[in-house]
């Protein structure tokens, strides 16, 4: 009986760990627009390329696929499709997420700020 109780408690604890793990909560797009200031030094929120590629329609787009932008081979061959999970990892630590990419940005460590920024990027359609 004691083993069954221990097993049940362990299963519940693991369930909570999975539910509360690294899953990002929905962000606030209005706050994300403010966070985008960090991105706007290199990226436009429309189709225009600058130092970085334009981010219009970035969510759902294959990485390294904006016409007219000169991507690193690492980015072009990454097989990443930008979604909440891949954007979160890349925005948190670009070099860790995709070693050898050429984006000279250290990343955003704050999970809430990343959630907000991703929510804003989702509005760029």
In which residue ranges do the predicted regions lie?
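Bulky hydrophobic/aromatic "packing anchor" residues in well-ordered structure
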Residues: 14-16, 55, 103
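Short Fe-S-cluster ligation motifs
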Residues: 67-88
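Sec-exported extracytoplasmic/periplasmic mature domains
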Residues: 37-47, 60, 92-96, 122-125
